Amino acid sequence: MSPQTETKASVGFKAGVKDYKLTYYTPEYETKDTDILAAFRVTPQPGVPPEEAGAAV
């Protein structure tokens, strides 16, 4: 049987969820003629920020 090795979670990859507004949300984005836009009505649950609820769509 091979010996066990210890792995460190902080090396190479850090698991977890980042806030949408910190990674992808860009309110200053200007649309282009080639963009395809879609609209959804989203009502966040109590305690959920609107941009996080929108990110789930």
Curated annotation (Swiss-Prot):
- Pfam family of the protein (one): RuBisCO_large_N
Q: Which cysteines are joined by disulfide bonds?
A: none
Look up keyword Plastid and say if it applies: yes
- EC supergroup of this enzyme: lyase
Membrane among keywords: no
* Residues where N6,N6,N6-trimethyllysine is found: K14
Tell me the residues on which N-acetylproline occurs.
P3
Catalysed reactions, semicolon-separated: 2 (2R)-3-phosphoglycerate + 2 H(+) = D-ribulose 1,5-bisphosphate + CO2 + H2O; D-ribulose 1,5-bisphosphate + O2 = 2-phosphoglycolate + (2R)-3-phosphoglycerate + 2 H(+)
Q: Which UniProt keywords apply?
A: Acetylation, Calvin cycle, Carbon dioxide fixation, Chloroplast, Lyase, Methylation, Monooxygenase, Oxidoreductase, Photorespiration, Photosynthesis, Plastid
Where in the cell? Plastid, Chloroplast
Q: Name one GO cellular component term.
A: chloroplast
> Propeptide spans which residues?
1-2
Q: Which domain of life is it from?
A: Eukaryota
> Matching InterPro entries, A to Z?
RuBisCO, RuBisCO_lsu_fd_N, RuBisCO_lsu_N_sf
- Molecular function in Gene Ontology: monooxygenase activity; ribulose-bisphosphate carboxylase activity
A GO BP entry = reductive pentose-phosphate cycle
Q: What does this protein do?
A: RuBisCO catalyzes two reactions: the carboxylation of D-ribulose 1,5-bisphosphate, the primary event in carbon dioxide fixation, as well as the oxidative fragmentation of the pentose substrate in the photorespiration process. Both reactions occur simultaneously and in competition at the same active site.
The record's comment on protein family reads:
Belongs to the RuBisCO large chain family. Type I subfamily.
* PANTHER family according to UniProt: RIBULOSE BISPHOSPHATE CARBOXYLASE (PTHR42704), RIBULOSE BISPHOSPHATE CARBOXYLASE LARGE CHAIN (PTHR42704:SF15)
- Provide the assembly information: Heterohexadecamer of 8 large chains and 8 small chains.
Q: What is this protein called?
A: Ribulose bisphosphate carboxylase large chain
Please tell me the species this chain comes from. Buxus sempervirens (Common box)
Instruction: From the UniProt record, report the name of the gene that encodes this protein.
Output: rbcL
